[in-house]
């Protein structure tokens, strides 16, 4: 009877007014900084971002221009760093059997969109410098999930991870990202 009671309660609850509360999307006139987002299709690159001037910026390129760098801003419109966009040829996921040993491993988790804390932790651990550049040599950075949720700066974290992956690899280091329950 308990389950039947729950079912009946849930059934009658469905009749409630589910009209969304909050502003109508058509009425929103101020957007926060967002992006850049890259889309690559049929040999064309499309870059979308909402700029600090509250404008939607869409740029298209034929292919991937050599030396392309994009500005990465925080949610409150502070320029954080530039990220070079690298062409990825024949992407292969590293095998779990890879047992490369590193002199040092630095692990961090549960970033929850807090770029400021992520950067402070990496700087304190001497993984990056004040310019958000890899200084951890041929060592290993492990990011153990939960990049998303709560904080407003998820995208800058993702761009920094992308940037650090290439910088680490260039000097024999490695960045490993493991999905957490917020990414699944």
Could you describe each region identified by the protein language model?
Residues 1-21:
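Bacterial Sec-dependent N-terminal signal peptides
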Residues 14-184:
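Feature recognizes metal-dependent phosphohydrolase scaffolds
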């Amino acid at each position: 009877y308990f389950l039947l009671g729950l079912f009946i309660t849930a059934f009658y609850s469905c009749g409630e007014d589910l009209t969304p509360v909050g502003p109508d999307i058509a009425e929103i006139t101020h957007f926060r900084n967002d992006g850049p987002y890259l889309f690559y299709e049929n040999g064309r690159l499309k870059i979308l971002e909402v700029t600090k001037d509250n404008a939607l910026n869409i740029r298209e390129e034929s292919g991937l221009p050599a030396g392309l760098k994009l500005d990465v801003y925080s949610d409150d419109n502070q320029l954080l760093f530039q990220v070079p966009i690298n062409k990825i040829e024949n992407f292969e996921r590293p095998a779990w059997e890879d047992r490369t040993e590193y002199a040092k491993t630095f692990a961090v988790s549960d970033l929850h969109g807090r770029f400021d804390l992520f950067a402070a932790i990496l700087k304190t651990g001497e993984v990056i410098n004040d310019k958000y550049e890899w200084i951890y040599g041929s060592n290993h950075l492990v990011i153990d999930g939960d990049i998303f949720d709560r904080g407003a700066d998820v995208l800058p974290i993702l761009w920094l991870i992308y940037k650090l992956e290439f910088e680490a690899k260039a000097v024999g280091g490695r960045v490993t990202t493991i999905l957490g329950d917020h990414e699944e």
